Amino acid sequence: PIFVVNWFRMNEQGKFAWPGFGDNARVLKWIIDRVEGRVVGEKSILGTMPKYEEIDWSGLDFTKEEFAGVTNLDKQIWLGELAGVKEWFEKMGAKLPARLAAIRDDLEAKFNKA
């Protein structure tokens, strides 16, 4: 499995949405638990994402609403990101593995249907 995390996502107030560096271990623990079958997550357009209750929140006041904010998949933002990836891929020309272009195209189609 491949896991993707955006530690630098900003909230509406222009501050980092995720609490900080030391709390990254909470997500890394979830990744290990997922690989080892101790958690199942929930399906999303991008794959499997953690459920709020699967993260160890001990010692941190991080609400379900805040978690929903950091795991939200905004269609327009993602379509913009994928457009940028397409431009970058086009610069690679024939050197780009076809599978990467196919994955990008598949994600774009999924977001367009959402």
Annotate each PLM feature.
Residues P1-A114:
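Flexible, glycine-rich loop/tail regions that form catalytic "lids" or insertion modules at the edges
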